[in-house]
Amino acid sequence: MAIPITVLDCDLLLYGRGHRTLDRFKLDDVTDEYLMSMYGFPRQFIYFLVELLGASLSRPTQRSRAISPETQILAALGFYTSGSFQTRMGDAIGISQASMSRCVANVTEALVERASQFIHFPVDEAAVQSLKDEFYGLAGMPGVIGVADCIHVAIKAPNAEDLSYVNRKGLHSLNCLVVCDIRGALMTVETSWPGSLQDCAVLQRSSLTSQFETGMPKDSWLLGDSSFFLRSWLLTPLPIPETAAEYRYNRAHSATHSVIERTLQTLCCRFRCLDGSKGALQYSPEKCSHIILACCVLHNISLDHGMDVWSSPVPGPIDQPPEGEDEHMESLDLEADRIRQELILTHFS
């Protein structure tokens, strides 16, 4: 059960004691356009978050006034979507930057506690078949129930001695594994892997591998790019296609896998704290991991509320560390190779 958290107002000396909860900012006092421009989400979505997280963000206190759940959520959304603790953001809702930082921490933890509620694979056969049908309708790739990729998110250096977070560009990052469906809804998110790990190593160590190797629906698989090794449950493109059927397979694979690429671009465009445009996340790796996951939870909640995942303008490919030559090598999984060749022969010849 989530433990309710109270954020005490750091500006108490400026405003004195009085009512137990501070409500300097009222949603009803501003326009929908203002909320979208400042916080990135519409009014009804924010009201839903207040209802969802309110119990975790509030608790009666006799000692001082607590910042309301509504204000805490606005502070967090402002940070997630802008990537910085701007003075104007705190001024808009009437709190200091120090209070904003605490609000972000508490809202982040409240969202992380609910991650499994909003990020998960479907379990019933009808839902799995629906995934297959939708992906097949996109580019003719059969049996696909999700598309996988990794994305690096820049973080500050944990300490001078720890090189595990240094990626191939010489920058500190977390390498995050993500799987989505055709709508861009996230079904698996792992955000704690250090940036020095290659994508194939992240996948090997992930819970996703144990989940799919212990059991998955028959004739079902994920699609991954050439940074992953071919597996019996994860199909990759052919490094050197030779026949017409192999070229058709690669084209269908690329068109289908582009869903996760667009989803990650949109995620970083909506949540600018992830794209590095305002600098690396200035927290410990664990807190950075939680912030990334919180943004992913918000992404899925927004889809559940009818917001279009593709509505945000996407500037272009995400700047990521280069792939190593070894990442284009095929694995020696003979069973996986047999499955892929059989698929090509059956569906693309």
UniProtKB/Swiss-Prot annotation:
Its cofactor is a divalent metal cation. Residues 149-300 form the DDE Tnp4 domain. Detected in adult brain, eye, nerve tissue and lung. Detected in embryo. It is found in: Nucleus; Cytoplasm. The keyword tRNA processing does not apply. GO terms for cellular component: centriolar satellite; cytosol; nucleus; plasma membrane. A divalent metal cation binds at residues 149, 199, 225, 261. Its EC number is 3.1.-.-. It comes from the Eukaryota. Interacts with NAIF1. Belongs to the HARBI1 family. Transposase-derived protein that may have nuclease activity (Potential). Does not have transposase activity. This is Putative nuclease HARBI1. It comes from Mus musculus.
